[in-house]
UniProtKB/Swiss-Prot annotation:
Gene name, Swiss-Prot/TrEMBL: eryH
InterPro entries to which the protein is assigned, alphabetical: Aldolase_TIM, TIM_sf, Triosephosphate_isomerase, Triosephosphate_isomerase_AS
Keyword set includes Cytoplasm: yes
PROSITE patterns, alphabetized: TIM_1, TIM_2
Protein known as: L-erythrulose-1-phosphate isomerase
Subcellular location: Cytoplasm
Assembly notes: Homodimer.
Superkingdom to which the source organism belongs: Bacteria
Catalytic activity, EC: 5.3.1.33
Length: 267
């Protein structure tokens, strides 16, 4: 299987900074590992130009959010048609910062995921429990609810359309985040994959995000239930991103042939 490894810039990088990153990444394309699918998610002001720079490369480019409607009186929003007009490949949905600060709900994430699939965009759906939910022993129930809500609206129309899930425990995100242990993350991934496959009837890759760094990326990707990495600040310099990509390739070399958790756990 292909391992997905990418980064979102969040609200960082000017257009020129994003383009410098993209150009360096394009230059490194000949050295890419075909077992690893790379992706970058810049700010809205940079997506079109970053995609233009990376068009001839294997790197996929996405947006950090979108509305579920194609058009209308939604001031300040971006529609899936607009993202397709920028020739984007994927769209990040439901990040915990969107849920906490901008009123994103399980319902709206589901609407957006369905809209993304209708328009040929790969949804990268973020899920994760808070520290309180983890401490109360509710992590698995919260993750099940989030996965079911995100996929309920796409189960009949998804077909074989690509869908990605990103497990990002809220307590592991940000400058003060505490990375989940590889064992803890792997156990959560196993449950997430099983729920997703029970809905869609097929495997869905589950990426880990939450303080991924050069010191833990190899152990994380070495877990059989972790299908990729969604990196934050450790990949905001292109050198940092390329370093983690090299470490991921080395970890894959040391591991046996990979299957997704859902492929192993369910018939």
């Amino acid at each position: 299987m292909v391992v997905w490894v990418g980064t979102s810039f969040k609200m960082n990088k000017t257009l020129e900074e994003a383009l410098a990153f993209a150009r360096r990444l394009a230059d490194a394309d000949l050295e890419r590992d075909p077992r690893v699918q790379r992706f970058v998610i810049p700010s809205f002001t940079a997506v079109r130009e970053v995609k233009r720079v990376l068009t001839e490369s294997s790197v996929k480019v996405g947006a950090q959010n979108m509305h579920w409607e194609d058009a209308g009186a939604w001031t300040g929003e971006i529609s899936p048609l607009m993202l397709k007009d920028c020739r984007l490949d994927l769209v990040e949905l439901g990040h915990s910062e969107r849920r906490e600060h901008f009123g994103e709900t399980d319902e709206t994430v589901g609407l957006k995921a369905a809209a993304a699939i209708r328009h040929g965009l790969t949804p990268l759906i973020c899920i994760g429990e808070t520290l309180q939910e983890r401490n109360e022993g509710r992590a698995d129930a919260v993750l099940r609810r989030q996965v079911e809500a995100a996929l309920r609206g796409v189960d009949t129309e998804a077909g074989e359309a690509p869908i990605l899930l990103a497990y990002e425990p809220v307590w592991a995100i940000g400058v003060n985040g505490i990375p989940a242990t590889a064992d803890y993350a792997s156990e959560r991934h196993r449950g997430i994959a099983e729920v997703a496959k029970s809905i869609l009837g097929r495997p869905v890759p589950v990426l880990y995000g939450g303080s991924v760094n050069p010191g833990n990326c190899e152990e994380l990707i070495g877990q059989p239930d972790i299908d990729g990495l969604f990196i934050g600040r450790s990949a905001w310099s292109v050198e940092g991103y390329l370093d983690i990509l090299a470490r991921v390739s080395a970890a894959i070399d040391r591991s046996s042939p990979r299957q997704t958790a859902s492929e192993r756990k369910l018939p």
